[in-house]
């Protein structure tokens, strides 16, 4: 099988990799780059566990081919930390109790980050709509919503 070369900005670093054209972006990130925050949940783009920020928008990587990432900018949870410490948004998730098993957390945080990067003062409805593509079986959604609202308030102060 022919290989393809993918050039991308991954977590702030220019990266290049040769891979199979039928490889999913999820598998490229996990297997080839070792970015294990990107989780496989449903494999249908419905649960949000595999969410990354792709050119500024949250996308599910289980339904994307790796080749679609050529010349793109991708942020995973590994790229969100600030100087090796949890970002403000990550801290807010912890402090609001929005983390239990943690499986959905990377996708939740990246979806929230994409929202707040575009709209630093979203309404409650905008938060609910933005987070609707991410499923959680543990905490429910009240604490997750509260964590995003808490981050908005802390950034305003």
Swiss-Prot record:
Cofactor binding mode and count: Binds 2 [2Fe-2S] clusters per subunit.
Domain 2Fe-2S ferredoxin-type intervals: 4-80
Enzyme class, spelled out: oxidoreductase
Subunit structure: Heterooctamer of NDHM, NDHL, NDHS and NDHF. Dimer of heterotetramers.
Role noted for this protein: Catalyzes the hydroxylation of nicotinate to 6-hydroxynicotinate. Also active against 2-pyrazinecarboxylic acid, but inactive against other nicotinate analogs.
Modes of activity regulation: Reversibly inactivated by selenide and sulfide. Not inhibited by cyanide.
A biological process from GO: nicotinate catabolic process
Binding residues for [2Fe-2S] cluster 1: 42, 47, 50, 62
PANTHER family xrefs: OXIDOREDUCTASE WITH IRON-SULFUR SUBUNIT (PTHR44379), XANTHINE DEHYDROGENASE IRON-SULFUR-BINDING SUBUNIT XDHC-RELATED (PTHR44379:SF8)
Keyword Iron-sulfur: yes
Gene: ndhS
Catalytic activity annotation: nicotinate + NADP(+) + H2O = 6-hydroxynicotinate + NADPH + H(+)
Top-rank taxon, per record: Bacteria
Matching CDD domains: fer2 (cd00207)
Alphabetical UniProt keywords: 2Fe-2S, Iron, Iron-sulfur, Metal-binding, NADP, Nucleotide-binding, Oxidoreductase
Heme keyword on record: no
Residue sites binding [2Fe-2S] cluster 2 per the record: 101, 104, 136, 138
Summary of pH dependence: Most stable at pH 8.0. Unstable at acidic pH values.
GO molecular function, one term: 2 iron, 2 sulfur cluster binding
EC number: 1.17.1.5
Name this protein carries in UniProt: Nicotinate dehydrogenase small FeS subunit
Cofactors named for this entry: [2Fe-2S] cluster
Pathway: Cofactor degradation; nicotinate degradation; 6-hydroxynicotinate from nicotinate: step 1/1
């Amino acid at each position: 099988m022919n290989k393809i070369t993918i050039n991308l900005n991954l977590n702030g670093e220019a990266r290049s990799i040769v891979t199979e054209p039928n490889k999913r972006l999820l598998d490229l990130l996990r297997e080839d780059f070792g970015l294990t925050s990107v989780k496989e949940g449903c494999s249908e783009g419905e649960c949000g566990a595999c969410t990354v920020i792709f050119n500024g928008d949250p996308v599910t990587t289980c339904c994307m081919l790796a080749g679609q990432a050529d010349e793109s900018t991708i942020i995973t949870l590994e790229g969100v930390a600030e100087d090796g410490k949890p970002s403000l948004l990550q801290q807010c998730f912890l402090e609001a109790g929005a983390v239990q098993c943690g499986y959905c957390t990377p996708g939740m945080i990246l979806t929230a980050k994409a929202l707040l990067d575009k709209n630093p003062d979203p309404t409650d409805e905008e938060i609910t709509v933005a987070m609707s593509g991410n499923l959680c079986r543990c905490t429910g959604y009240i604490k997750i919503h509260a964590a995003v609202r808490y981050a908005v308030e802390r950034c305003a102060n």
